[in-house]
């Protein structure tokens, strides 16, 4: 069952690339986000069923490269092409992003297995891919005014550097481990999503998570 969920994420990634090729960027972004939800589900299902394995870990990493490395890069590249940005800059930013994602996954797979998964070294490739997809979706919803087009290459490179960095991020599962935090967070997100828009709320939450790791690292250096 967990492997079927993982392969479903790969289907989402392939569909996203095809949709980008056909100019359906909004649907492509939605497919990447669907892959993100599936990626969050497969590991938990494997642990719940007691079938977690090294094979599952390697399979998940390979699928992550496509779902959150290749697909978001292709999406951003195609989104920025008509927006008066030099193709070489877009290409370089997207390549940096994919390299950062592959590096992050390779390093993660070499780390010794630990009983606690409360933190991760470097921003996860899944969160990075979801962030890029959300940025594109939100910008298209708000007529390209939410995030300046000129900032997209820099944002893409920053995410690449965060993935390759040693900045520690709390695992999302540990953040919502306490029941009251989970219920309060879901309730607040649901209210905001109804009031504003689902992708914008998701983008704000993801952006806050990315910024939290940076702020905590900066605080640790200045202490």
Model-identified regions with their sequence ranges:
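Active-site His/Glu-centered metal-binding helix of metallohydrolases
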Residues: 11, 37, 41-45, 62, ...
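C-terminal membrane-associated helical module and adjoining short loops/tails
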Residues: 117-223
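Hydrophobic, well-structured mid-protein blocks that either form specific transmembrane helices
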Residues: 88-131
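Topogenic membrane-insertion module of multi-pass membrane proteins
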Residues: 1-40, 216
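Hydrophobic alpha-helical transmembrane segments of polytopic
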Residues: 5-8, 28-35, 93-96, 100, ...
């Amino acid at each position: 069952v967990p492997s079927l969920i993982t392969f479903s994420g790969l289907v989402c990634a392939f569909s996203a690339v095809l949709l980008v090729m056909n100019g359906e960027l909004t649907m492509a972004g939605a497919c990447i986000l669907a892959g993100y939800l599936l990626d969050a589900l497969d590991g938990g299902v494997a642990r719940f069923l007691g079938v977690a394995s090294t094979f599952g870990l390697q399979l998940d990493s390979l699928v992550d490269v496509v779902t959150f490395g290749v697909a978001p890069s292709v999406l951003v590249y195609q989104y920025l092409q008509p927006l008066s940005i030099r193709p070489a800059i877009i290409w370089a930013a997207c390549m940096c992003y994919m390299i950062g994602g592959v590096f992050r996954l390779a390093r993660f797979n070499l780390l010794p297995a630990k009983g606690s998964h409360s933190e991760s070294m470097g921003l996860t490739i899944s969160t990075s891919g979801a962030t890029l997809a959300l940025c594109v979706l939100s910008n298209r919803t708000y007529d390209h005014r939410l995030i300046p087009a000129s900032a997209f290459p820099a944002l893409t490179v920053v995410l690449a550097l965060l993935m390759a960095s040693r900045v520690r991020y709390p695992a999302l599962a540990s953040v919502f481990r306490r029941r009251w935090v989970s219920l309060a967070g879901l309730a607040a997100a649901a209210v905001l999503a109804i009031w504003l828009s689902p992708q914008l709320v998701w983008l704000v939450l993801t952006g806050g998570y990315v910024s939290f790791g940076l702020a905590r690292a900066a605080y640790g250096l200045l202490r």
